[in-house]
Each structure stands twice: as structure tokens, then as C-alpha cells.
């Protein structure tokens, strides 16, 4: 059984490769199953979408004892296999969770630019979670550190992709 950490779209979780990370540092490949289309019919024939809890994640272990023998226990995490790549023309980057990666990159750039500067204040940088569902991570950070100034770095999905209304850049 898998419990979601953060927001997961079941439409992109099905039939994907993942890596299982054990608490003692071992890593194993995992594949997620997909619900066959004919099982996606709700009562009355209407289509229904699976939830992440409906999806099977398979690391190839025959049973719990075998998984335990390989150091796999409840609470170990699986993460999607994901590669960040350049497009053919080398002008754009393709990646999942781009908003998170972009935010961390901007924080890294900031820290690189101020690392040799004498600051008149304390600079604290961090990466937070669950901004889509109430800024929970940012709330914890601001409560714990009580900053005088707080900058959140994030971005929104692009609205200028092929087929959308409006012009490129809107």
C-alpha cells in the first residue's frame, strides 16, 4: 500500500518507473501498475478515475517476508524516475515538478550570489511543501523563524501552450 506524500495525479502515476529507497540506504526499482480501461467504468457505465490508492506498486517481492529480507519496511519511500532534459533545439528544458525545481534553483542562485557578502541580517533559505493546499510548509517556516521579510519563490503552469486561448507569453 502506498500513502501519498504531497499531491499526486493518478493519471500520471500509472505505468511509471519509480525507485524505492529503504531507510538503510538501499534502492530498488519499482513499477506502478495501471487500472485496465474496462475496470474504469463506474456503476451505470460512466467512466471513473482511479485514485493513487487503487494503483499497485510492484518491486517484485513475493511477500512481506521477502521484502523485509531486502530491508523494505512500511514507511520507506518511493520516488518517480524522472529526467530533466533539453529540447532538440537546446532552448527549453523538459521536466516534471518544474515549479519546485525552478524554486530550488533560484534559491541556490541567490545563495551563490551572496555567499561572500557581509549581510546586516540573518538569511535563512529553505524549500517548502504543500503550497498548493494552503501553504503548509511556508507556514511552518515562518512560524518557526518569525522573519521580518519572507520571499516565496514559485511559478504557475504555463498558459501559452499549443491549443490554449491567448497569445504566447500570456
Regions found by a protein language model. Give the residues of each.
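N-terminal hydrophobic/helix-forming segments and targeting peptides
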Residues: 1-170
Amino acid at each position: 500500500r502506498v500513502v501519498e506524500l504531497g499531491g499526486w495525479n493518478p493519471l500520471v502515476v500509472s505505468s511509471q518507473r519509480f525507485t524505492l529507497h529503504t531507510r538503510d540506504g538501499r534502492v530498488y526499482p519499482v513499477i506502478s501498475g495501471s487500472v485496465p480501461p474496462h475496470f474504469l467504468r463506474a456503476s451505470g457505465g460512466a467512466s471513473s478515475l482511479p485514485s493513487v490508492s487503487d494503483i499497485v506498486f510492484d518491486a517484485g517481492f513475493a511477500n512481506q517476508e521477502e521484502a523485509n529480507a531486502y530491508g523494505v519496511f512500511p514507511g520507506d519511500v518511493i520516488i518517480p524516475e524522472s529526467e530533466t532534459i533539453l529540447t532538440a533545439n537546446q532552448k527549453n528544458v523538459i521536466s516534471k515538478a518544474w515549479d519546485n525545481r525552478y524554486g530550488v534553483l533560484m534559491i541556490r542562485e541567490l545563495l551563490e550570489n551572496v555567499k561572500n557578502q557581509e549581510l546586516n541580517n540573518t538569511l535563512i533559505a529553505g524549500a517548502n511543501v504543500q503550497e498548493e493546499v494552503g501553504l503548509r510548509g511556508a507556514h511552518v517556516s515562518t512560524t518557526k523563524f518569525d522573519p521580518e521579510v519572507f520571499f516565496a519563490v514559485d511559478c504557475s503552469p504555463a498558459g501559452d501552450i499549443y491549443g490554449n486561448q491567448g497569445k504566447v507569453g500570456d
